[in-house]
UniProtKB/Swiss-Prot annotation:
InterPro entries: C2_dom, C2_domain_sf, Synaptotagmin. Keywords: Calcium, Cytoplasmic vesicle, Differentiation, Membrane, Metal-binding, Phosphoprotein, Repeat, Transmembrane, Transmembrane helix. The modification Phosphoserine is found at S135. This is Synaptotagmin-4. The chain crosses the membrane at residues 17-37. It comes from the Eukaryota. The keyword Lipid metabolism does not apply. GO terms for molecular function: calcium ion binding; calcium ion sensor activity; calcium-dependent phospholipid binding; SNARE binding. Residues 73-93, 127-147 are annotated as: Disordered.
């Protein structure tokens, strides 16, 4: 039989072919991975950024460089100032300070010798390096002044509005307030700060720092809201509340400013604005609303079960819209608070449904010296909450509060529910 011979060259070619295919496979895999990464990165950059809030103090620019050009320093800045057209010194502040919230210019504030200039004045839109006019209708506020509010001077609020399309950011800069009234009668000064809310949702609430002992506070604080589409800006409104901090009691409310953004064009640049501060428009209703409470006294375990069921017809706390109510429950023994509970906050509703149960241990036999206080409050993030209404149930309580208390004492172990009218807190 002839011997079988194999070619060694065939075995030598196999590793070479495998190596070539492996190299091609590796290059293809790396290229595919790089392509997928690039696609993911580009898709992320095109998505609308999630809501994000940035707060900048003391006028630090959130955009250190212009979007289209770098910032110039030194001699270049001087040349820019020289090349800018001369702007009359009073073109901004005279136009805006003399205008009321309806966009009108009262004749009583006109300077002698120049009545026509200010009567025909219009609000100004200031851009980077140029200025253009805006129709007066775009700056009108829906809040009108009464004769009493015009007589009472509460000062002027200065601020600016801007929308950055590249970053999808709405920017509000609270610059200063001038001519605030003195809320401290001893020092004849105030400790002012400002709360700002974006309406109608009321979910964006911010506030400035407190400036001590001044009637002309210069805040210069920038608040930036990311993720608000420009098409939605026209549907919003800004509500500013000017307050004076009080260390020992509730902060004093100086006044408020309401700015509807409908008709205000922010597509061309930053807009400088000011508004007269008006007295807070608290709606005086015939009542403070009603509260549905269920009580049950367990004489065997000496416990009191309190169920906060519903609230209805709660008034608006101010022009910022509906309140965010919650209920605080305080248990008193001989006029001393021994326990406290509170419900969750219900957002933007005058008719809240709570359905929350609390069990209190009674430290004595019977309910003679026991009373329960219910406080309905409007939740305000970052500040002291305002009391909408109050209710007291106990042996010494008048009206339905005393009747409800007598029923649970006469019928222990029975859950008894009643509606109660809230009174001023």
């Amino acid at each position: 039989m002839a011997p079988i011979t194999t070619s060694r060259e065939e075995f030598d070619e196999i590793p070479t072919v495998v190596g070539i295919f492996s190299a091609f496979g590796l290059v293809f895999t790396v290229s595919l991975f790089a392509w997928i990464c690039c696609q993911r990165k580009s898709s992320k950059s095109n998505k609308t950024p999630p809501y994000k809030f940035v707060h900048v103090l003391k006028g630090v620019d959130i955009y250190p460089e212009n979007l289209n050009s770098k910032k110039k320093f030194g001699a270049d800045d001087k040349n820019e100032v020289k090349n800018k057209p001369a702007v009359p010194k009073n073109s901004l502040h005279l136009d805006l300070e003399k205008r009321d919230l309806n966009g009108n210019f009262p004749k009583t504030n006109l300077k002698p010798g120049s009545p026509s200039d200010l009567e025909n004045a219009t609000p100004k839109l200031f851009l980077e390096g140029e200025k253009e006019s805006v129709s007066p209708e775009s700056l009108k506020s829906s809040t009108s002044l009464t004769s009493e509010e015009k007589q009472e001077k509460l000062g002027t609020l200065f601020f600016s509005l801007e929308y950055n399309f590249e970053r999808k950011a709405f920017v509000v800069n609270i610059k200063e307030a001038r001519g605030l009234p003195a809320m401290d009668e001893q020092s004849m000064t105030s400790d002012p700060y400002i709360k700002m809310t974006i309406l109608p949702e009321k979910k964006h609430k911010v506030k400035t720092r407190v400036l001590r002992k001044t009637l002309d506070p210069a805040f210069d604080e920038t608040f930036t809201f990311y993720g608000i589409p420009y098409t939605q800006i026209q549907e919003l409104a800004l509500h500013f509340t000017i307050l004076s901090f009080d260390r020992f009691s509730r902060d004093d409310i100086i006044g408020e400013v309401l700015i509807p953004l409908s008709g205000i064009e922010l597509s061309e640049g930053k807009m400088l604005m000011n508004r007269e501060i008006i007295k807070r428009n608290v709606r005086k209703s015939s009542g403070r609303g009603e509260l549905l409470i269920s009580l049950c006294y367990q004489s065997t375990t000496n416990t009191l079960t309190v169920v906060v069921l519903k609230a209805r017809h709660l008034p608006k706390s101010d022009v910022s819209g509906l309140s965010d109510p919650y209920v605080k429950v305080n248990l008193y023994h001989a006029k001393k608070r021994i326990s406290k509970k509170k419900t969750h906050v219900k957002k933007c509703t005058p008719n809240a449904v709570f359905n929350e149960l609390f069990v209190f241990d009674i430290p004595c036999e019977g309910l003679e010296d026991i009373s329960v206080e219910f406080l309905v409050l409007d939740s305000e993030r970052g500040s002291r909450n305002e009391v909408i209404g109050q209710l007291v149930l106990g042996a010494a309580a008048e009206g339905t509060g005393g009747e409800h208390w007598k029923e649970i004492c006469d019928y222990p172990r029975r859950q008894i529910a009643k509606w109660h009218v809230l009174c001023d807190g």
